[in-house]
Amino acid sequence: MPPKKGGDGPKQPPLIGRFGTSLKIGIVGLPNVGKSTFFNVLTKSQAAAENFPFCTIDPNESRVPIPDERFDFLCQYHKPASKVPAFLNVVDIAGLVKGAHAGQGLGNAFLSNIFACDAIFHMTRAFEDEDIIHVEGCVDPVRDIEIIHEELRMKDEEMIGPIIDKLEKTAVRGGDKKLKPEYDIMCKVKSWVVDEKKHVRYYHEWNDKEIEVLNKHLFLTSKPMIYLVNLSEKDYIRKKNKWLVKIKEWVDAHDPGALVIPLSGGFESKYQDMSDEEKQKYCEENKTQSILTKIIKSGYSALQLEYFFTAGPDEVRAWTVRKGTKAPQAAGKIHTDFEKGFIMAEVMKFTDFKEEGSENAAKAAGKYRQQGRNYIVEDGDIIFFKFNTPNQPKKK
């Protein structure tokens, strides 16, 4: 069957942010809200989780494997010599405080660490504990969210002024017509962030040209954000906390579409130390379960990443690509020669492979398809690439 021709497929929405696959998500919040405890559980590492502000000064970074039943199934089926899952790069960033944009606390260093990330786990505290001081004196997660939001917005406001001044000098007073569109776009960004006091990502109607300009500057408020609400173990198990509704209302009003995920660092830490039998018994008795898998997958998705599989007896591997990646560029993740000499991608959907029971059965059922260079790779595709080897240099 020849590769399908067709068009370029559905138009993908433009993506705000760094282009690439080695992207990071940072854990951000006020001091003593549970960031390092969460990071420790997430990465099974032992970053210092001390009860005082700024105990995490150098960001701790870790690669967290993405839990995936499809990957596990392929490994069980092929029993490969090598297994390589996809990973989420997570950074534990020290607590921000009010005034961080102006250098309060260790503000400038922490904000630069957030600049280096591509999405944010925004952690807020909704548990009371006399032994764990709160930097603001009392627990109020909505206030805490607003503090972090305002610090990020104020830092962007500081950046926007000089950018517009420079563009005004060259595009308006200097008459450089090529830069005039960028100047106009930055004025729109200024109106939104400085005058309306909103985050870049709140506005969902940025067009391609505007996103091109936003991606030159990578503003803090353009980064996707997932809200993690840290509860006590008791509240997490009973699925009740007086702050949850208020937090959801705030997020729906200010950051519509953003995820709010309740968790309990205390529960997850305890759960991680249990044996499999103890975990099962505890979860059945308390009608609860770990939320880590959902958080990890949500973080990966927030970075606009997905992965395809190559699978066989030598290796089962998940290859990370940006959403909307076409087959030749996906092939290039394996080796540049695969992209240069791309002929076609032979693609099976994981569900078809599992349902039919083997590659040959999937072929016989017409579910093993040959796709051309316009094919947009989908999450969980199992792909075999065909390519021409580039000509070797001729010997003299």
Swiss-Prot record:
Signal peptide: none annotated. Residues 23-283 form the OBG-type G domain. The keyword Chaperone does not apply. It comes from the Eukaryota. It holds the Pfam family YchF-GTPase_C. A motif (Nuclear export signal) lies at residues 267-274. Residues 304-387 form the TGS domain. Its cofactor is Mg(2+). Hydrolyzes ATP, and can also hydrolyze GTP with lower efficiency. Has lower affinity for GTP. This is Obg-like ATPase 1.
